[in-house]
């Protein structure tokens, strides 16, 4: 299906706006993947806030020109799916997790913070916990000293109340 000029401009504008909002771009080759698997990948991506698009590579190159994702323009060859996400690790997680179970999806690379990523870079990015998990871990670290202090104070109070209960019993035995 051939696109006319206005349709191409609309696609470029849409992808340019996605690229402007996104922190991460992941590129994967989808040669031989079934429609059912692609539908599952798209629904997983949508639920995690990742925008997946199958684009003509020429349009994708034009859309990312001048953006932080321009560094991967040379990787845009062959049948590719492009994953954009505002969350720094979401696109990498979705594509890497799906690629583990489906060997037809091959990660080709990506970009993060204006730097090109190779396959290993995308996989390392996918292994980083999400922002919510990192914030929960930080809260746990900050709460740890407070909760330890509360436990120690509770133990001291319990020990002191046991000690005061033993003193009258000791006086009764002595009498």
Curated annotation (Swiss-Prot):
Report whether Amino-acid biosynthesis shows up as a keyword of the record.
no
**InterPro entries in alphabetical order:** Ribosomal_uL10 (IPR001790), Ribosomal_uL10-like_sf (IPR043141), Ribosomal_uL10_bac (IPR022973), Ribosomal_uL10_bac_type (IPR047865), Ribosomal_uL10_CS_bac (IPR002363)
Q: Note the coiled coil stretches, chain numbering.
A: none
A cellular component term from Gene Ontology for this protein is: large ribosomal subunit
Query: What are the entry keywords?
Result: Ribonucleoprotein, Ribosomal protein, RNA-binding, rRNA-binding
Extract one GO molecular function annotation from the record.
large ribosomal subunit rRNA binding
Q: Which SUPFAM superfamilies match?
A: Ribosomal protein L10-like
A Pfam match is Ribosomal_L10
Which processes are annotated in GO (biological process)? translation
Function, as annotated, reads: Forms part of the ribosomal stalk, playing a central role in the interaction of the ribosome with GTP-bound translation factors.
Return the protein name.
Answer: Large ribosomal subunit protein uL10
Q: Which organism is it from?
A: Delftia acidovorans (strain DSM 14801 / SPH-1)
């Amino acid at each position: 299906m051939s696109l006319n000029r206005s349709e191409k401009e609309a696609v470029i504008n849409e992808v340019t706006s996605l690229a402007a909002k996104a922190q991460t771009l992941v590129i994967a080759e989808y040669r031989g993947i079934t429609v059912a698997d692609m539908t599952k990948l798209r629904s997983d991506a949508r639920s995690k806030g990742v925008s997946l698009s199958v684009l003509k590579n020429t349009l994708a190159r034009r859309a990312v020109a001048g953006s932080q994702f321009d560094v991967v323009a040379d990787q845009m060859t062959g049948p590719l799916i492009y994953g954009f996400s505002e969350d720094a690790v979401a696109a990498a997680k979705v594509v890497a997790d799906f690629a583990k179970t489906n060997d037809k999806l091959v990660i080709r690379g990506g970009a993060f913070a204006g730097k090109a990523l190779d396959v290993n870079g995308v996989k390392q990015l996918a292994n980083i916990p999400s922002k919510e998990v990192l914030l929960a871990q930080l809260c746990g670290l900050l709460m740890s000293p407070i909760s330890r202090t509360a436990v120690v104070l509770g133990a001291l109070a319990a020990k002191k109340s046991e000690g005061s209960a033993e003193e009258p019993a000791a006086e009764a035995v002595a009498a």
